[in-house]
Swiss-Prot record:
It is an enzyme of class 1 (oxidoreductase). It comes from the Eukaryota. This is Alcohol dehydrogenase 1. Gene3D superfamilies: Medium-chain alcohol dehydrogenases, catalytic domain, NAD(P)-binding Rossmann-like Domain. Belongs to the zinc-containing alcohol dehydrogenase family. Class-I subfamily. GO terms for molecular function: all-trans-retinol dehydrogenase (NAD+) activity; zinc ion binding. Zn(2+) 2 binds at residues 97, 100, 103, 111. Keywords: Acetylation, Cytoplasm, Metal-binding, NAD, Oxidoreductase, Zinc. PROSITE patterns: ADH_ZINC. It comes from Mesocricetus auratus. The modification N-acetylserine is found at residue 1. It is found in: Cytoplasm. Its cofactor is Zn(2+).
Length: 374
């Protein structure tokens, strides 16, 4: 048994930004009290990992990135009650302590114990569980899934159906849930409504799946890459438009298409100009616009208050507005019950050692989601 012992394993270490990941042998310490050590089985490559790898999302280095994954509990620290060795689990980049003001609030989900706002790169106790060549290696967003083994706090892991295929449901750890939940849980898209989705990558396509599930009548995909339109329509988009095909602002085009603007718009690009376009494209009196895309670095928007005074709602969500520990097991159960698909989002499956190839696919726009398997 490996319980209580240091485990030596492979991990993708980022020593410095804008350099390839280095596959290294690292040591993973046993879990302390209220911590869980997980043997990773599969992990997705998400744009947020790329933002960290390029330095646009500032995090301490060296680090083991990865935050969208699934695995099996190897051992648990003292006092852990929600999971046991052998359980299938998904680590949670947005934890749920259950005690803070946010966790107790019925409508909010960004637990104050998260490591998103100003990443320390540690577990809750302020220390790391990884070492390599004598150096301490930082954790990423409470998860660090680009390692054969990782250690997480108990509040940052959810037990899931033991029959679930981990190489698919790992997407529920971030990308799918972030998009799908933004439509069904956070914006609460209504039956018969009109929706516009800006950005048709993995998260944008997941928004489309959510809009369709919620019963939207019109789902308009917006992207400058028309190669993405076929997949968007396959998953529920009723039409797709390319802003480059018009000689006027895309918000005007959408307003004309939808009698003054859509009921719900979603920005899944992470650019200031598309955030403004998405806001302007929802109806001035009753529209709701949701920001999902993360801007690579902190920039300010300047907004005319008249855009909001008529009754528009403008809001943002992380992880689809879901309380993570509560929602993830239910979402996995819904997937197992065939309430939504994940397979169309996975375009590439690569062995973990080919992580740099996976990031090349992301950066070149050739993949929707690449899943790395261990």
């Amino acid at each position: 048994s490996t319980a209580g012992k240091v485990i030596k394993c492979k991990a993708a270490v980022l020593w410095e930004t804008n350099k390839p990941f280095s596959i290294e042998e690292i040591e993973v310490a046993p879990p302390k009290a209220h911590e869980v050590r997980i043997k990773m089985v599969a992990t997705g490559i998400c744009r947020t990992d790329d933002h960290a790898a390029t330095g646009n999302f500032v995090t301490p280095l060296p680090i083991v990135l990865g935050h969208e994954g699934a695995g099996i509990v190897e051992s648990v620290g003292e006092g852990v009650t929600s999971v046991k060795p052998g359980d299938k689990v998904i680590p949670l980049f947005s934890p749920q302590c259950g005690k803070c003001r946010v966790c107790k609030h019925p409508e909010s989900n960004l637990c104050i114990k998260n490591d998103l706002a100003a990443p320390r790169g540690t577990l809750l106790d302020g220390t790391c569980r990884f070492t390599c060549k004598g150096k301490s290696i930082h954790n990423f967003l409470s998860t660090s899934t680009y390692s054969q083994y990782t250690v997480v706090d108990e509040m940052a892991v959810a037990k899931i159906d033991e029959a679930s295929p981990l190489e698919k449901v790992c997407l529920i750890g971030c990308g799918f849930t972030t998009g799908y939940g933004s439509a069904v849980q956070f914006a609460k898209v209504t039956p018969g409504s009109s929706c516009a989705v800006f950005g048709l990558g993995g998260v944008g396509l997941s928004v489309i799946i959510g809009c369709k599930t919620a019963g939207a009548a019109r789902i308009i995909g917006v992207d400058t890459n028309k190669d993405k339109f076929a997949k968007a329509k396959e998953l529920g988009a009723t039409e797709c438009i390319n802003p480059l095909d018009y000689n006027k602002p895309i918000a005007e085009v959408l307003q004309e298409m939808t009698d003054g603007g859509v009921d719900f718009s979603f920005e899944v690009v992470g650019q200031l100009d598309t955030m403004m376009s998405a806001l302007d494209s929802c109806h001035a009196a009753c529209g709701v616009s949701v920001i999902i895309g993360v801007p690579p670095n902190a920039q300010n928007l300047s907004v005319n208050p008249m855009l909001l005074l008529g009754g528009r709602t403008w809001k943002g969500a992380i992880f689809g507005g879901y309380k993570s520990k509560d929602a993830v097991p239910k979402l996995v159960a819904d997937f197992m019950a065939k309430k939504f698909p994940l397979e169309p989002l996975i375009t590439h499956v690569l062995p973990f050692e080919k992580i740099n190839e996976g990031f090349d696919l992301l950066r070149s726009g050739k993949s929707i989601r690449t899943v790395l398997t261990f």
